[in-house]
C-alpha cells in the first residue's frame, strides 16, 4: 500500500468563452473518447439554443439548472454486524456539483431529440424549470435518504 498519501487535487482551468470552471467541468464530463473540441461545440451550441428558447442569459440558466439538480442528502452503504444499512449522509459541496453535472449529462444522452446539443439544451431547460430526468433522480435520492432516516445514527 502506498505511503505517499492521496494524490493532489488538480484544478481545472476556466473555459475561454464564459471564464467559468463549472463550464469546463461540464465540458469534460460531456466528452467521449478524448474529443474535447466536439464536446465544446455541443455545449456552446446547447447554450445558444437555451438562450433562444428561454430569452434569458444562457450561463445563468446553466448555473441555475446545475444548482437545482444538486442533491443535499444521499445514502451510503454501511455494514453493521452482518447487515448492510443504507445510511443517509449529507453530500459534500464538490460532490454535489459532480453529481449534478453527471446526472444532467446522463439524462440528456437518454433524451429523444436528434442532436446532442438539442438534448442537452432540453435537459438544461427542464432542470432550470425543476422538471426532467435529472431533477427526478435528485428527488429519488432524497426519498431514499428520507426513507432510511432511521439509520442516520450509523453515520461515521
From Swiss-Prot:
Q: What is this protein called?
A: Small ribosomal subunit protein uS7
Q: Which UniProt keywords apply?
A: Ribonucleoprotein, Ribosomal protein, RNA-binding, rRNA-binding, tRNA-binding
What's a single GO BP term from this record?
translation
- Biological function: One of the primary rRNA binding proteins, it binds directly to 16S rRNA where it nucleates assembly of the head domain of the 30S subunit. Is located at the subunit interface close to the decoding center, probably blocks exit of the E-site tRNA.
The organism's taxonomy opens as: Bacteria, Bacillati, Bacillota, Clostridia, Natranaerobiales
Q: Which GO terms describe its cellular component?
A: small ribosomal subunit
**Signal sequence extent:** none
Organism expressing this protein natively: Natranaerobius thermophilus (strain ATCC BAA-1301 / DSM 18059 / JW/NM-WN-LF)
Q: Which SUPFAM superfamilies match?
A: Ribosomal protein S7
Q: Per UniProt, what is one GO molecular function of this protein?
A: tRNA binding
What the entry lists under Pfam families is as follows:
Ribosomal_S7 (PF00177)
User: Which Cys-Cys disulfides exist here?
Assistant: none
Description of how the protein assembles with itself and partners: Part of the 30S ribosomal subunit. Contacts proteins S9 and S11.
The entry's family comment says: Belongs to the universal ribosomal protein uS7 family.
Could you tell me the superkingdom of the organism this chain comes from?
Bacteria
Amino acid at each position: 500500500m502506498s505511503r505517499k498519501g492521496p494524490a493532489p487535487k488538480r484544478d481545472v482551468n476556466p473555459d475561454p468563452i464564459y471564464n467559468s470552471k463549472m463550464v469546463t467541468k461540464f465540458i469534460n464530463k460531456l466528452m467521449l473518447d478524448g474529443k474535447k473540441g466536439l464536446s465544446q461545440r455541443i455545449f456552446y451550441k446547447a447554450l445558444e439554443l437555451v438562450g433562444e428558447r428561454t430569452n434569458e442569459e444562457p450561463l445563468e440558466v446553466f448555473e441555475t439548472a446545475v444548482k437545482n439538480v444538486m442533491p443535499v442528502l444521499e445514502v451510503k452503504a454501511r455494514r453493521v454486524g452482518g447487515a448492510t444499512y443504507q445510511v443517509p449522509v449529507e453530500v459534500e459541496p464538490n460532490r454535489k456539483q459532480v453529481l449534478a453535472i453527471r446526472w444532467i449529462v446522463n439524462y440528456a444522452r437518454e433524451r429523444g431529440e436528434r442532436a446532442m446539443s438539442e438534448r442537452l439544451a432540453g435537459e438544461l431547460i427542464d432542470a432550470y424549470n425543476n422538471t426532467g430526468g435529472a431533477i427526478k433522480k435528485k428527488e429519488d435520492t432524497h426519498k431514499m435518504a428520507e426513507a432510511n432516516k432511521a439509520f442516520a445514527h450509523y453515520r461515521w
